[in-house]
Amino acid sequence: MKEKVLSIPTPFGAPLDLYKNTWGKTGDTLSIVSGLQGDHLNGMYLNSRLSQFLDSVVEGIDPNYTLKGRVVSFPVANLNAIQSGSKLWPYDGLDMDLAFPGNPQGETTEALASAIYTHTADSYWGFILQSAPPHYEDAPHLLTLKVDGRIKNLCRDLQIETARKINES
């Protein structure tokens, strides 16, 4: 289900709308966010493909899969930066990675971060799909707040060889 979760008036005419997609109803929630920065196109592409797959599972088109739990997806978090073709939206110059938990009354990027944070706060799992910097070789990896059996099982299921624990500060 596609749902508009935020609409911000802009100085350029049409409002900036933030959408989320949701599949499933109950169980642990997985939140997936992509498009935090305008130059991270790979994450948006992966999120789009995943959305198509989840649609086919929920609609029963692919009977080999069932959805256990709930998935929430923000495929395009920072549309202004994407439309400008740059990492940041030049109008406010804020890095969305650093804007969380956001401020609903703040700059546009802060308001977007606040809405995403609010709609993903109850998630057990959270993925941010992004790209490595240009000319940088990177392997798929997982950053986690804690290492436990569920994280180890997730890495095994996704065939991710590297999981790093984030130091809480």
List PLM regions with ranges.
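Structured catalytic-domain cores with a bias toward divalent-metal coordination
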Residues: M1-S169
